[in-house]
């Protein structure tokens, strides 16, 4: 299982742990990933995704999974999230 957020694309970063004596040792900064189930209002389905805590707050702020995916850039989304986005767009196009 990769350590990349499916909605925001956040991935591990590298850097230094710096001690009080200014000694530096390499470390990894891992994203805070959580397994969550999000519900699409348009599709009436639930989807299990592995997303970061920051992405979960953004989904809530934008008003749900459908609104988040409508604004999200395709480059940041995983293949699974991109498929959900295309399916939502298709249903909205037929409904309009």
From Swiss-Prot:
One BP annotation, GO: translation
Highest rank taxon of the organism: Bacteria
GO CC term, one of those recorded: cytosolic large ribosomal subunit
Matching Gene3D superfamilies: Ribosomal protein L28/L24
Keywords: Ribonucleoprotein, Ribosomal protein
SUPFAM superfamilies: L28p-like
InterPro entries: Ribosomal_bL28 (IPR026569), Ribosomal_bL28/bL31-like_sf (IPR034704), Ribosomal_bL28_bact-type (IPR001383), Ribosomal_bL28_sf (IPR037147)
This protein's name: Large ribosomal subunit protein bL28
Organism: Cereibacter sphaeroides (strain ATCC 17025 / ATH 2.4.3)
